[in-house]
């Protein structure tokens, strides 16, 4: 008889946890919640200290500080108790630092010697560092890459001047080394790391870095701009050209990394979709470092010459909206996220948001009598909401060489599938029993089940007939639903295209009948368009989803009561029956079958241009899905990151003279990096047959590599090629 399997040592771990407590082993499986995950990381750090010959139980270590930071906003009782326990330890125990002999749990980073700046240049900087050394030491206990937590409403970390000493740094990522002019403060990393865990799970850490260029804003003022193109919609039948809206244009810019192409290269995505079955969004963090600020002056000579100078006193303003106070404005919907090429500099998008307005546009067509009704009413005083970053979000001032870290945000989202379903209602449950089977090879027209249709057993919802067929038998629910494709609704602010869940269904050649709702993306050279393309016309693609929504409008019909066979013209409504006698307008164009029995898959991730996560609506009845992103944050979402070159004034500035400030032309280049962590489930093969996977052919292989002048493009990739059963 085989000996019993050894059970992992649990130690003094309270119920509901696997690692929160002393004496447990490190092989208990996946943590149960964020506090338990912090405890596991803490235990791993303690194990590393013990292996190096140090006793962390007698000292307060950086691992203890990281646990305090990660449980600062813990909602569970265990996390709260652990948080205050280590705060008490911090008050009484001597400090143990991370050195080469005292390891931490972050990725190992070898300290590098850097040249010490000339003392005659930085003597004032050294005095300032000495005065603030205590605070700097506390800041360095929780660098970004060591897992600092971004709490709801908490303060991000600004590490602008750290202890220099001999120039040796500690900690992973951008947390080590000395700050200041001429000294690097971070690393440039665009690797995707796959860590294979137990039970078929994979931890995917996507690192991304970009050089970001930011000009000073055209104006330091907030502006309310009314866009009014009533000349276009004054023409009959042109309602869809309506662009009327009001927006607040701000002097800030938005650093938005919420697109798949920011994080994964085409090879990464191929590996993920070919080997994984689902993705879980875990955490997100980002950092700004190596800030450079320069002024631009122009000579009076002809032709004029521009001179660029470093400005060590100019400031870069940074604000993290961790409480989501500002309007949520994901940039992927406008293709204005950070660029997808790590080696190319990118720009943040100017930040703006919608402002309330009312208007009336009555639909028309070319045969409508009279002039189209198109009235702009303006803003309702009851609905005015004017937001400014300066009085709503803490703003941090960075100078040359400074850095800023957001800490870690943990997501609360449902997983995203990387497989598609093909089963519709006609493929659910037990097929009918066949009285006889084919006797010859290749027979494809086996026409009769063998039992007369009005004598079969089973369940239907047909009230006055005994026929049981594949068309009439009762199924458990409705897979997908019929929805109108080109349907525009109207609000008090104008018409809008009704969003629908995209999916396969209907003839691709006739979109008016197909009602697929596949998203169509338009983008420029930063986001996949061929890099040598000239002109303003963007490149486009339509993402044709593999999911079968269950709808096929060409085959719909409505049967009259009472049921009759065969049906006559008076007993049935077909897709070919027009509405109002208009050619091509059929009842299926307005037919919606969504209801409580509807089964529907989530939207697919669209690589590279699609949005990754979205913010949940602040409504009492919330949508089950969002069509623009597969991950919907259940409570909070990562705070938006805003940047702005601070006003660099001249001596001619007079606040009473003009609305425009007299400013020195200033711009900033800074390095941005982020880390986005997923957990994925390896896809198991349960079928005999091999399946189609994401691949390329000879014709499109060279889209992914540059030509002799550097021209290249990014071609979108499918994300749900592998099939799965849904019932």
UniProtKB/Swiss-Prot annotation:
One of its GO terms (cellular component) is host cell. Disulfide bonds join 633-637. Residues 19-64 are annotated as: Phospholipase A2-like. Keywords: Capsid protein, Clathrin-mediated endocytosis of virus by host, Cytoplasmic inwards viral transport, Disulfide bond, Host nucleus, Host-virus interaction, Magnesium, Metal-binding, Microtubular inwards viral transport, T=1 icosahedral capsid protein, Viral attachment to host cell, Viral penetration into host cytoplasm, Viral penetration into host nucleus, Viral penetration via permeabilization of host membrane, Virion, Virus endocytosis by host, Virus entry into host cell. A motif (Nuclear localization signal) lies at residues 4-13. Mg(2+) binds at residue 323. Residues 1-10 have a biased composition (Basic residues). It comes from the Viruses. Residues 1-38, 95-120, 141-184 are annotated as: Disordered. The keyword Magnesium applies. GO terms for biological process: clathrin-dependent endocytosis of virus by host cell; microtubule-dependent intracellular transport of viral material towards nucleus; symbiont entry into host cell via permeabilization of host membrane; viral penetration into host nucleus; virion attachment to host cell. InterPro entries: Capsid/spike_ssDNA_virus, Parvovirus_coat, Phospholipase_A2-like, VP1/VP2. Gene3D superfamilies: Parvovirus coat protein VP1/VP2. Residues 25-35 have a biased composition (Polar residues). One of its GO terms (molecular function) is metal ion binding. It is found in: Virion; Host nucleus. Residues 166-183 have a biased composition (Gly residues). The keyword Membrane does not apply. Belongs to the parvoviridae capsid protein family. Capsid protein self-assembles to form an icosahedral capsid with a T=1 symmetry, about 22 nm in diameter, and consisting of 60 copies of two size variants of the capsid proteins, VP1 and VP2, which differ by the presence of an N-terminal extension in the minor protein VP1. The capsid encapsulates the genomic ssDNA. Capsid proteins are responsible for the attachment to host cell receptors. This attachment induces virion internalization predominantly through clathrin-dependent endocytosis. The capsids of autonomous parvoviruses expose a proportion of VP2 N-terminus and part of that sequence can be cleaved of to form VP3. The N-terminus of VP1 is sequestered within the mature capsid. It contains a phospholipase A2-like region and nuclear localization signals that might be exposed by capsid modifications during virus entry. This is Capsid protein VP1. It comes from Feline panleukopenia virus (strain 193).
């Amino acid at each position: 008889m085989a000996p019993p399997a050894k059970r992992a040592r649990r130690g003094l771990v309270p119920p509901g946890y696997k690692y929160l407590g002393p004496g447990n082993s490190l092989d208990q499986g996946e943590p149960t919640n964020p506090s338990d995950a912090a405890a596991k990381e803490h235990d791993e750090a303690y194990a590393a200290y013990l292996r190096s010959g140090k006793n962390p139980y007698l000292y307060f270590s950086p691992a203890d500080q990281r646990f305090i930071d990660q449980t600062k906003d813990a909602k569970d009782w265990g996390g709260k108790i652990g948080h205050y326990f280590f705060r008490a330890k911090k008050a009484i125990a001597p400090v143990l630092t991370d050195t080469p002999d005292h390891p931490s749990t972050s990725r190992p980073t070898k300290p590098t010697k850097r040249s010490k700046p000339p003392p005659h240049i930085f003597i004032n900087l050294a005095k300032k560092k000495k005065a603030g050394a205590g605070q700097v030491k506390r800041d360095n206990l929780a660098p970004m890459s060591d897992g600092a937590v971004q709490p709801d409403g908490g303060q991000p970390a600004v590490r602008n001047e750290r202890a220099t000493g001999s120039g040796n740094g500690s900690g992973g990522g951008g947390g080590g080394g000395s700050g200041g002019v001429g000294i690097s403060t971070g690393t440039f990393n665009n690797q995707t790391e796959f860590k294979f865990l137990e039970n078929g799970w994979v931890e995917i850490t996507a690192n991304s870095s970009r050089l970001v260029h930011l000009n000073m804003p055209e104006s330091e003022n907030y502006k309310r701009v009314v866009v009014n193109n009533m000349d276009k919609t004054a023409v009959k039948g042109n309602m869809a050209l309506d662009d009327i809206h009001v927006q607040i244009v701000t002097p800030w810019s938005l650093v938005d990394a919420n697109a798949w192409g920011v994080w994964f290269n085409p090879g990464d995505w191929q590996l993920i979709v070919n080997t994984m079955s689902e993705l879980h969004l875990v955490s997100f963090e980002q950092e700004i470092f190596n800030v450079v600020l320069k002024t631009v002056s122009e000579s009076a000579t002809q032709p004029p010459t521009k001179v660029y100078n470093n400005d060590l006193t100019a400031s870069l303003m940074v604000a993290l909206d961790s409480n989501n106070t500002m309007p949520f404005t994901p940039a992927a919907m406008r293709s204005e996220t950070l660029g997808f090429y790590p080696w190319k500099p990118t720009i943040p998008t100017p930040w703006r948001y919608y402002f309330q307005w009312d208007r009336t546009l009555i639909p028309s067509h070319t045969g409508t009598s009279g002039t189209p009704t198109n009235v702009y009413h303006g803003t309702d005083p009851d609905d005015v909401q004017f937001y400014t970053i300066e009085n709503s979000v803490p703003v941090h001032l960075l100078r040359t060489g400074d850095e800023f870290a957001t800490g870690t945000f943990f997501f609360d989202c449902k997983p995203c599938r990387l497989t598609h379903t093909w089963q519709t209602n006609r493929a659910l449950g037990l097929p009918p029993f066949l009285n006889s089977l084919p006797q010859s090879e290749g027979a494809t027209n086996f026409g009769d089940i063998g039992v007369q249709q009005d004598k079969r057993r089973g369940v239907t919802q047909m009230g006055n007939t005994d026929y049981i067929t594949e068309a009439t038998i009762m199924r458990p629910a409705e897979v997908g639903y019929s929805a109108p494709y080109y349907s525009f609704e109207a609000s008090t602010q104008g018409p809008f295209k009704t969003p629908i869940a995209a999916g396969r269904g209907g003839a691709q050649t006739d979109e008016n009948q197909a009602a697929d709702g596949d998203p169509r993306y338009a983008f420029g050279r930063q986001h996949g368009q061929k890099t040598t393309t000239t002109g303003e016309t963007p490149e486009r693609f339509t993402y044709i989803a593999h999911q079968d929504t269950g709808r096929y409008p060409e085959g719909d019909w409505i049967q009259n009561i009472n049921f009759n066979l065969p049906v006559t013209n008076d007993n049935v409504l077909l897709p070919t029956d027009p509405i109002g006698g208009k050619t091509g307008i059929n009842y299926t164009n307005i037919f919606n079958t969504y209801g409580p029995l509807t089964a529907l898959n989530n939207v697919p991730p669209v690589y590279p241009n699609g949005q990754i996560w979205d913010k949940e609506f602040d409504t009492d009845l919330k949508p089950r899905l969002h069509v623009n992103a597969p991950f919907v944050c259940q409570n909070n979402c990562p705070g938006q990151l805003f940047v702005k070159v601070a006003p660099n004034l001249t001596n001619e500035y007079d606040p009473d003279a003009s609305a425009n400030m007299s400013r020195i032309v200033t711009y900033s280049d800074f390095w941005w990096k982020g880390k986005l962590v997923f957990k994925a489930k390896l896809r198991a093969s349960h079928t005999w047959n091999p399946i189609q996977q994401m691949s390329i052919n000879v014709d499109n292989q060279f889209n992914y590599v540059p030509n002799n002048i550097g021209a290249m493009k990014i071609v979108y990739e499918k994300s749900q090629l592998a099939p799965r059963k849904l019932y």
